[in-house]
Amino acid sequence: MNINLDPDLAAIVAQAKSANPNPPHPADIPLEVFRAGYVMQGRLQATQGLHCDTVYDTSIESDACVVPVRVYRAKGSQAAAPGLIFIHGGGFTIGNLDLHDSLCRQLAIEAAVTVIALDYRLAPEHKFPAAVEDCLAATRWILANAAALQLQANTIAIGGDSAG
């Protein structure tokens, strides 16, 4: 199959291929190295110009765990805003709150919602289904405490990328 790329993008792809013509398969990269690369990618996403009225870190406690979360409220948000529970991607093995900070800010601003990003426990340090259990526990807590979080209880969505 032949794909016609934009000339600027084609130049970037050609440069990347020439720099490393035989990249390793992701399964062959040690997890620590893979995680470090993922973190570096996240740092390339600037948050300049994406100013939410409120951004704070807290945690949600359940019977089984403590789930770190980050809450984003856009400027001018209504007293009780719609909510988005954001679950980051990374195959339940990589990722954290910082990697999707820019995206969560953008979602809060452009969709006029309060975003609550979850930072679940990662495998293989925590056996499956620990990450899923973290997300379920945090979601249940958020739904039960919507008023305290200034959320409209009937307008809370769940989203994310990849594993999220």
Q: What residue spans do the PLM features occupy?
A:
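A glycine/proline-hinged amphipathic helix-loop "lid/cap" segment
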Residues: 1-71
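Short glycine/serine/threonine/alanine-rich loop segments
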Residues: 40, 113, 151
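Proline/glycine-enriched tight loop/beta-turn segments at coil->beta junctions
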Residues: 65-67, 74-84
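Short strand-loop-helix active-site module centered on a catalytic nucleophile
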Residues: 69, 85, 107, 118, ...
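Active-site glycine-rich loops that stabilize anionic/oxyanionic intermediates
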Residues: 81, 88-93
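Conserved catalytic-core motifs of eukaryotic protein kinase domains, centered on the activation segment
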Residues: 96-98, 126-128
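Short amphipathic alpha-helix adjacent to the substrate-entry channel of hydrolases
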Residues: 98-118
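Short beta-to-alpha linker loops that shape the active-site pocket of alpha/beta-hydrolase fold enzymes
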Residues: 119-123
